[in-house]
């Protein structure tokens, strides 16, 4: 039986997902679907995902916030999973700045982000929405996105196992390398895959390096709250460490890497120049 391959992007909030979505839409055209509007009633059961793929025969790539890991096993379809991990505190800071720029005044998170400083907003999340603050990525990978209580080391173990089974693993701080790896490892299925991109939703004036952004966050939050945030996200920090090691292991096997990096950057620069000239 000939298998149909579908690339599925797990869009974790503020893990560079909008830029990945942009790259996928450009690469796959009409064969790509962002499906959050198709599934607006909570997490997507595996049976519904299979039904959706069966009903939309042109689809070769999907992106959404609501998919459950791992993807379903199916005799006809082969789901190739893509997910990027990010430093959890950097993700929280990015989420705050993004949320306060939104125009939806009816959203309680938008209202609170606009009204509160970063530390006060994070404390508000701690009180009212801990599922948006504590070990979010461990919850997504290790507990199918369900959050009735904070994830445990048991869920971390499951998250790491799930991470290691991803067809495409990326680290936000090595974003270009992650997409280069995706192009390389998926070429047997998608031989012409081009994931060059133009960055989306980048905060104006954002410090360039992770260390600079974390220093900025520590100054704003103070040492005491910053240490608490690290403690509240200890599982995500361990997941990131394991993810970085697994990504490095995979990346070392890609041949001619410096040439690939140069060519990928040139493609991205060309896209950016085209957009600026338009």
At which residue positions do the language-model features occur?
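Viral RNA-dependent RNA polymerase
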Residues: 4, 14-15, 86, 103
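Non-transmembrane alpha-helical segments in soluble domains
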Residues: 21-25, 167, 179-183, 237-244
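N-terminal pre-catalytic "stem/leader" segment of glycosyltransferase-like enzymes
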Residues: 7-37, 43-44
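PAPS-dependent sulfotransferase catalytic domain
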Residues: 34, 41-84, 90-199, 215-216
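PAPS-dependent sulfotransferase catalytic core
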Residues: 46-47, 63-70, 195-268
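Aromatic-acidic/polar surface patches that form glycan- and anion
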Residues: 2, 10-13, 17, 55, ...
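Membrane-proximal basic amphipathic "stem/tether" segments
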Residues: 1, 262-278
